[in-house]
């Protein structure tokens, strides 16, 4: 849900933030098809654990943590120093973020068995971040990079429910599919939101509830916070998980050795 660097990562072909990984994946496929076509099935098969089974359904968890834990999270939020707040998403998302706070790292460790049971596969922690949305809060429609294959989205505090919308689980979109949405137009986000084939549904999490979803295979978005809510706010804790043992697959720099295609070494991991 959030790039860990100081910029929002997108490409011309994949115009949403956090799209860099998918662009690298299809670039790698094109290279393999050109220089060693016989290796393409092996490449696709090797990275298959990062995909999401289409039978998965978004899951709402009622109070996965007790009141004392929620109070402890709020205490951390209340006592954050201004220097701890990352500002690079303030304009685009109307939020401040804090990545991998020690308390949240421990909380994420505790959540591993919960998420593993919900998603039906063993997982390990990827990264986490606290998201402090203000009256300008918004989250444009996007897919996450597979570093966030699974997301545990905990509503820590809010002044009113803020809807979030999810598509069904989808195969990763290739350039041809995206051309159907974008086609050089600036309304590609609305075209995705209104696509009947994506079957968007809406959830309105309450304080203490959490949503488990597959951000890398489900389009998702939040419309701007309703200005009628006044001094609106929403504090969310995102904890991202990956299938256990797949960390190396996430780094394009490892793909050359993975399938014996030296030309893939030119691919660089996003910084």
Where do the model's predicted regions map?
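Catalytic core of non-heme Fe(II) oxygenases with the double-stranded beta-helix
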Residues: 135-216, 246-253
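Short beta-strand His + acidic residue motifs that chelate non-heme Fe in jelly-roll/DSBH
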Residues: 139-142, 219-230
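A short hydrophobic beta-strand segment most commonly corresponding to one strand
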Residues: 151, 228-247
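Glycine- and charge-enriched low-complexity intrinsically disordered segments
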Residues: 251-271
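A short coil-to-beta-strand element that immediately follows conserved catalytic motifs
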Residues: 119-130
């Amino acid at each position: 849900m959030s790039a860990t660097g100081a910029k929002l990562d997108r490409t011309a072909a994949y115009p949403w933030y956090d799209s860099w990984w998918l662009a690298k994946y299809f670039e790698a496929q094109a290279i393999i098809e050109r220089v060693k076509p016989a290796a393409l099935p092996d490449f696709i098969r090797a990275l298959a654990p990062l995909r999401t089974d289409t039978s998965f359904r978004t899951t709402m968890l009622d109070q996965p943590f007790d009141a004392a834990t929620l109070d402890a999270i709020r205490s951390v939020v209340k006592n954050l120093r201004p220097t701890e707040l990352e500002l690079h998403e303030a304009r685009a998302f109307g939020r401040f973020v804090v990545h991998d706070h020690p308390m949240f790292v421990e909380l994420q460790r505790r959540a591993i068995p919960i998420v593993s049971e919900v998603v039906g596969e063993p997982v390990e922690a990827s990264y986490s971040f606290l998201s402090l949305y203000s009256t300008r809060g918004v989250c444009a429609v996007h897919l996450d990079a597979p570093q966030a294959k699974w997301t545990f989205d905990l509503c820590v505090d809010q002044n009113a429910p803020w809807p979030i919308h999810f598509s069904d689980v989808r195969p990763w979109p290739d350039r041809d599919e995206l051309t159907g949405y974008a086609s050089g137009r600036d309304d590609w986000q609305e075209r995705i939101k209104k696509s009947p084939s994506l079957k968007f549904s809406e959830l309105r999490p309450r304080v203490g509830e959490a949503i488990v979803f597959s951000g890398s295979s489900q389009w998702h978005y939040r419309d701007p916070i309703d200005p009628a809510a006044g001094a609106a706010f929403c504090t969310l804790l995102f904890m991202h998980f990956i299938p256990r043992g797949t960390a190396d697959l996430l780094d394009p720099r490892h793909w050359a050795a993975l399938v014996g295609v030296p030309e893939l070494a030119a691919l660089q991991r996003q910084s």
